[in-house]
Structures are given as C-alpha cells and as structure tokens.
C-alpha cells in the first residue's frame, strides 16, 4: 500500500519557468536529456531542469494562464445565466421601465458572446499552434506552471528522502546513531 505523505508547508505548487545559458545545461528530470529550462518555486527551495516539450504535457504541468482562463469562462457563464434568470423574472413582473432596458441587455449579451467566441478562438489557435510546433521556441506561452499532483508529490518525496539521508549521515558521523558499549562489566 502507498503511504500518504503529509503536504509540506514549505512547498507551494507554483513554479516559474526560467532559462539558463547553453553552458549550464543539466539533465531533464524526466528523460535525462540536456536541457536549459528550469522550473523553480517562488521561495527557491525547489528547482529542477525539464525539457520544454514536457511542459506541453497536461499530465506533467498546467500553465497558470490556462487555469485562469477556464475559471474566468466559468464565472462569465454563471453571470450570463444569472442575467438571463433576472430577465425572465422581470418579464414575469411586467415592469414597463425594465422592458425598455431589455434591448440594451440584449446588445450587452451579444457583445459578451462575441468576447467569449473570440477568447475561445484564441485558445483554439494557441492549442493548434502548440500541437503543430515541435521545436522549442525562445518565447514561452506561460511562465508560471502548476505541476500535476503526482509529479508534485514526487518532488515532496524527493526532498523528504534527501532530508532523511542527510540526517542519517550526520548521525553516523557524530556517532550518536550507533549504540553505545555496555557500561557494566559482563558477568
């Protein structure tokens, strides 16, 4: 059975993409090919090298801008639904003043729909361009990423194992990790 690791307070699942020079390339965390892309936390406690192609994989990391755009679309859809329900309630009450404002609301709704359509068209163009381009470009679409929960747990486990190994090495060097000889003489 898998042992659940407690979430560490010192790590946050918010990574910034940085680029190092060609001389400082190190192996990728996933495929061990030399890469110049580094994901690093705000606190700089955790960093690792990763190929740019892995960042495109939704099973590895999700760009923060994509998460925000999805939540914004959900919020706008909820607001539109509320506006429509208010319009239905206004029609039921039959207030003449509110019926004069209805054409303006319809114009606003069509403008919102156009904005949503243009945003979805932009997302489709981004998705098609990212899937069609196979080589790494120097311009990145997003500089901030959230790791997939399993990858993030791997990073936490890596640091926990590293801390345990350092503690064991310290105890062995100081001699406190070994049992002491008996203080009483043997019979």
Curated annotation (Swiss-Prot):
GO CC annotations, alphabetized: cytosol; endosome; nucleus
Bias kind Basic and acidic residues: ranges: 81-92, 99-117
Highest taxon of source: Eukaryota
Protein's organism: Schizosaccharomyces pombe (strain 972 / ATCC 24843) (Fission yeast)
Positions of region (Disordered): 81-142, 165-187
Protein name as catalogued: UPF0589 protein C32H8.01c
GO biological process annotation, one example: vacuolar transport
Record Pfam families: Vfa1
Biased composition (Low complexity): 118-142
Family from the record: Belongs to the UPF0589 family.
Lineage, uppermost ranks: Eukaryota, Fungi, Dikarya, Ascomycota, Taphrinomycotina
């Amino acid at each position: 059975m898998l042992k659940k690791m407690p979430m560490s307070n010192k790590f946050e699942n918010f990574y910034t993409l940085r680029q190092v020079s060609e001389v400082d390339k190190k192996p990728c965390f996933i495929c061990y090919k030399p890469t110049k892309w580094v994901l690093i936390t705000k606190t700089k406690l955790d960093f690792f090298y990763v190929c740019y192609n892995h960042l495109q994989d939704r099973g590895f990391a999700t760009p923060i801008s994509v998460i925000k755009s999805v939540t914004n679309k959900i919020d706008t859809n909820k607001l539109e639904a509320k506006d429509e329900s208010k319009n239905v309630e206004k029609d039921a009450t039959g207030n003449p003043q509110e019926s004069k404002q209805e054409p303006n609301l319809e114009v606003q709704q069509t403008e919102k729909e156009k904005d949503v359509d243009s945003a979805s068209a932009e997302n489709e163009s981004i998705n098609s361009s990212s899937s069609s381009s196979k080589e790494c470009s120097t311009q990145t679409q997003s500089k901030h990423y959230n790791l997939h929960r399993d990858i993030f747990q791997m990073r936490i486990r890596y640091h926990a194992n590293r801390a345990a190994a350092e503690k064991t090495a310290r105890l062995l060097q100081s001699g406190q990790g070994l049992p002491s000889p008996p203080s009483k003489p043997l019979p």
